Curated annotation (Swiss-Prot):
Pfam families: PP-binding (PF00550). It comes from the Bacteria. Involved in some intermediate steps for the synthesis of the antibiotic polyketide bacillaene which is involved in secondary metabolism. InterPro entries: ACP-like_sf (IPR036736), PP-bd_ACP (IPR009081). Pathway: Antibiotic biosynthesis; bacillaene biosynthesis. GO terms for cellular component: cytosol; membrane. Disulfide bonds: none annotated. The keyword Cytoplasm applies. GO terms for biological process: antibiotic biosynthetic process; lipid A biosynthetic process. GO terms for molecular function: acyl binding; acyl carrier activity. Keywords: Antibiotic biosynthesis, Cytoplasm, Phosphopantetheine, Phosphoprotein. The gene is acpK. This is Polyketide biosynthesis acyl-carrier-protein AcpK. 4'-phosphopantetheine is transferred from CoA to a specific serine of apo-ACP by sfp.
Length: 82
């Protein structure tokens, strides 16, 4: 799975949790908080993405991520090493 596909999985799950963002033009620099995701939304998005990617990693490994582009990068690295 390539980085673009992981980014698409992220976007799909973001839009599922935050349907008001459907049609939004997502950029790697977008931050979930700025997009309107509260802590529960963010946890749900992460859980759904990890499930979609069949990853089991501690959430703490994602804590330093600043935006969805960085999140896609970290997830890509985890998929490659899984």
């Amino acid at each position: 799975m390539d980085k673009q596909r992981i980014f698409e999985v992220l976007i799909t799950n973001i839009c599922e949790v935050l349907p008001e963002l459907d049609g939004h033009r997502f950029e790697p620099e977008d931050q979930l908080v700025e997009l309107g995701a509260d802590s529960v939304d963010r946890a749900e998005i992460i859980t759904m993405v990890l499930e979609d990617l069949s990853l089991k990693i501690p959430r703490i490994e994602l804590s330093g991520v600043k935006n969805i582009g960085e999140l896609a990068e970290v997830l890509y690295d985890k998929v490659q090493s899984a």
